[in-house]
Amino acid sequence: MNIDLNADLGEGCASDSELLTLVSSANIACGFHAGDAQTMLTCVREALKNGVAIGAHPSFPDRDNFGRTAMVLPPETVYAQTLYQIGALGAIVQAQGGVMRHVKPHGMLYNQAAKDPHLAQAIAKAVHDYDPSLILVGLAGSELIRAGERHRLVTRQEVFADRGYQADGSLVPRTQPGALIHDEEQALAQTLDMVQAGRVKSVTGVWTTVTAQTVCIHGDGEYALAFARRLRAAFNARNIHVIA
């Protein structure tokens, strides 16, 4: 069994270099919520050195709140902003002799696109128009995945090791109790359930089905590095191969 393990990087965390030795895919911030040209270049070089698949991590323009502010923007604006960010990272990757593999939206852009078909359509169109061979990563079972499929993009359905789920398969908003899983054992058990059994237990106790093609571990988490090591060990023990 294979699984992709991804992390959001280039967001100002000291553990980026070490995480790149543990994950198979890196989602690199493109400057709208975090990062800048130099951090993008540094992350790209480190990812290439470690053989890690590189992806753009576009966001709403929200550096003040790390891309977590809800916004109502015209789809054309979201299309342009997404294209701009993908293009910026793509230029750096190309200049370093690499190939960009995927796009995964960040924060509130990701969450809103999971439920808003118009927003999802704008993002999927931007990815397709930039490079139709790129993989679009989105929340498992979301509108973003459906939009990607409509544009005939290869999609990857994502699950989260350290986030709480609602009964409909969506993430618990960060403003609500149960949004983040701080207990390492619970996060590990949830991840293995999603990957091996295709199910997740919601905060209300209801089990729901989920398709896990890639697992996200947050690079900005306090224990991200230690948890990544534990997760890799758990996968190895169960003959689950981490591969992009």
Swiss-Prot record:
It is an enzyme of class 3 (hydrolase). Its EC number is 3.5.2.9. SUPFAM superfamilies: Glycoside hydrolase/deacetylase. GO terms for molecular function: 5-oxoprolinase (ATP-hydrolyzing) activity; ATP binding. CDD domains: LamB_YcsF_YbgL_like. One of its GO terms (biological process) is carbohydrate metabolic process. Forms a complex composed of PxpA, PxpB and PxpC. Catalyzes the cleavage of 5-oxoproline to form L-glutamate coupled to the hydrolysis of ATP to ADP and inorganic phosphate. PANTHER family: 5-OXOPROLINASE SUBUNIT A, UNCHARACTERIZED PROTEIN YBGL-RELATED. Gene3D superfamilies: Glycoside hydrolase/deacetylase. Belongs to the LamB/PxpA family. The keyword Nuclease does not apply. Keywords: ATP-binding, Hydrolase, Nucleotide-binding. It catalyses: 5-oxo-L-proline + ATP + 2 H2O = L-glutamate + ADP + phosphate + H(+). Pfam families: LamB_YcsF. This is 5-oxoprolinase subunit A.
